């Protein structure tokens, strides 16, 4: 099982064909926004996208929950996907058939087992998540069957959206879609509870009812794909024990009028960051306009990067 590696050159060509970009884009080598960027706090965004280059970003620490989420996403592609979109050098954005296989879970567990946790907490988390991966696959199959996308189901298609008053496009890739519907898939994995009285550790699955931790961020991502495609949204959230499917039919937040309201939040964040990039024009002085919060959970597990960031802001 492999993660998709986008050709930078082909992606840049595609973005360039969408919209004429300002000169300062070349200075920071950042030519688009994305839903995940917009959901990231300004200090973490600045460190990742204005300070680090793309190769350095690819080496940022990951954890077992991220690996587990990748596994479930790719199991979904093999389960219902017919087409996957990829950027191919010299060809641009192209469709490729997803090969059929009966060993969907075997591929996932092989990929899962290749990950080597670096901290004791992540090692314990990885052990728990391994127990839950097969259960999560069961939940995934049931949920995808309930949603019932029609063939041919496509995966990872890149779409763009221009925000009012912003110079850069917002780019994102759709998890699963058919002619009239799309699915945004989110996974929740075991969280560590307080130690028992005897000192042993226990884990529990996080809640996935409406309003769960991360709900607002996920709504923004769904809103982006809805506004970019006009298709009916399905927010599929699962853990190893259950799943929930949120649509405009059962969730007020996913009704078109409420999703459209989120465009203003996207615009505010994107425009603020564009103004920072334009003002500082490639210089590291952008830190003057972004206040860091190193106690935020985003910085947990960042290792040496946290030390670098503290020095970057002059807090050492």
Regions found by a protein language model. Give the residues of each.
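Metal-dependent nuclease catalytic cores that hydrolyze phosphodiester bonds in DNA/RNA
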Residues: 1-174, 178
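Short histidine-centered catalytic/ligand-binding loop motif
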Residues: 61, 203-214, 251-252
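Conserved catalytic cores of phosphodiester-cleaving nucleases, focusing on short active-site segments
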Residues: 72, 172-209, 224-225
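Hydrophobic/aromatic-lined pockets within catalytic cores
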Residues: 76, 80-84, 187-190, 224-230
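A structural signal for short, well-ordered beta-strand segments and their strand-loop junctions
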Residues: 154, 177, 181-185, 233-237
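Short, solvent-exposed loop/turn segments at secondary-structure junctions
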Residues: 160-162, 188-190, 240-243
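Metal-dependent nuclease catalytic regions and adjoining charged, substrate-binding loops involved
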Residues: 195, 214, 227-316
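Short, charged, amphipathic alpha-helix that recurs within catalytic cores of restriction-modification
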Residues: 211-225
């Amino acid at each position: 099982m492999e993660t998709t590696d986008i050709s930078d050159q082909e992606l840049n060509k595609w973005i360039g064909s969408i919209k004429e970009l300002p000169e300062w884009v070349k200075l920071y080598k950042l030519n688009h926004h994305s839903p995940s960027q917009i959901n990231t706090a300004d200090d973490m965004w600045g460190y990742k996208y204005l300070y680090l280059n793309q190769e350095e970003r690819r080496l940022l620490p990951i954890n077992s929950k991220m690996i587990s989420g990748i596994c479930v996403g790719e199991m979904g592609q093999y389960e219902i996907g017919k087409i996957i979109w990829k950027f191919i050098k010299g060809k641009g954005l192209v469709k490729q058939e997803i090969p059929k296989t009966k060993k969907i879970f075997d591929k996932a567990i092989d990929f899962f087992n290749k990950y080597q946790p670096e901290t004791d907490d992540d090692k314990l988390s990885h052990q728990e998540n391994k127990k839950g991966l097969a259960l999560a696959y069961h939940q995934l199959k049931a949920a995808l069957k309930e949603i019932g996308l029609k063939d041919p189901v496509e995966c990872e298609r890149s779409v763009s959206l221009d925000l009012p008053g912003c110079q850069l496009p917002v780019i994102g890739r759709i998890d699963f879609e058919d002619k009239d519907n799309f699915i945004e898939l989110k996974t929740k994995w075991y969280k560590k509870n307080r130690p028992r009285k005897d000192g042993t550790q226990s884990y529990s699955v996080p809640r996935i009812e409406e309003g769960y931790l991360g709900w607002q961020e996920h709504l923004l991502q769904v809103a982006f794909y809805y506004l970019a495609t006009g298709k009916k949204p399905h927010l599929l959230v699962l853990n190893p024990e259950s799943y929930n499917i949120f649509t405009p039919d059962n969730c007020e937040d996913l009704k078109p009028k409420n999703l459209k309201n989120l465009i203003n939040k996207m615009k505010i964040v994107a425009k603020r960051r564009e103004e920072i990039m334009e003002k500082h024009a490639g210089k590291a002085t952008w830190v003057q306009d972004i206040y860091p919060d190193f106690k935020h959970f985003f910085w947990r597990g960042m290792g040496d990067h946290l030390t670098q960031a503290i020095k970057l802001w002059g807090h050492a």
